[in-house]
């Protein structure tokens, strides 16, 4: 789904756009020939952030149930506190200065970086969220965002599958023309 993007539209506009579209599809699932019990969210990188935050928003509304979250190398912590943010800060495609710039463009001010809807990894509780499939790349600044989120989901009793993509960098699902390893990602999704 397209949603309005930062920097022109800062948080919460992109999230609200996505959630509004998700809710419309969910509430009108039969019109689209979709089983309402199987409406899932997913995304990669910033899109995975929006998908995870959508799950947090939906759990506040008993009439809406996200069936699954599919997250590819999710950026889930605007404070960039994970060790991988420093370990892979440069030389692996997505660098630390780009991450800082993107987060700064997304939020109105620094304090929002601690908001669970900006940084789902920092949300107070992950209980009641949908099952998750999370892909993380070995050489990626946000690798530990995905790993820590998966761990927190499991601790909250959420069925979670974590896939570690050895030798891959951020953006791996878009690299099928470059490496056959990227193609295996799609076969894992279908399982």
Per-range role (PLM):
Residues 1-191:
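Alpha/beta-hydrolase superfamily serine-hydrolase fold, recognizing
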């Amino acid at each position: 789904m397209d949603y309005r993007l930062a920097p022109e539209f800062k948080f919460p506009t992109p999230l609200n756009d996505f959630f509004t579209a998700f809710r419309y599809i969910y509430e009108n699932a039969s019109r689209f020939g979709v089983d309402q019990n199987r409406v899932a969210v997913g995304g990669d990188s910033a899109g995975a952030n929006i998908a995870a935050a959508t799950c947090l928003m939906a759990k506040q509304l008993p009439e809406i149930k996200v069936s699954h979250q599919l997250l590819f190398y999710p950026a889930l912590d605007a404070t960039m506190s994970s060790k991988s943010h420093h370990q892979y800060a440069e030389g692996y495609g997505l660098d630390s200065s780009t991450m800082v710039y993107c987060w700064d463009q997304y939020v109105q001010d620094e304090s929002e970086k601690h908001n669970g809807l900006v940084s789902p990894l920092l949300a107070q509780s992950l209980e009641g969220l949908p099952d998750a499939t999370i892909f993380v790349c070995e050489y990626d600044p946000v690798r530990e965002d995905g790993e820590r989120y998966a761990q927190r989901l499991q601790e909250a009793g959420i069925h979670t599958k974590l896939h570690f993509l050895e030798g891959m960098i951020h953006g791996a699902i878009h690299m099928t023309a470059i490496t056959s390893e990227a193609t295996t990602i799609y076969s894992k999704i279908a399982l």
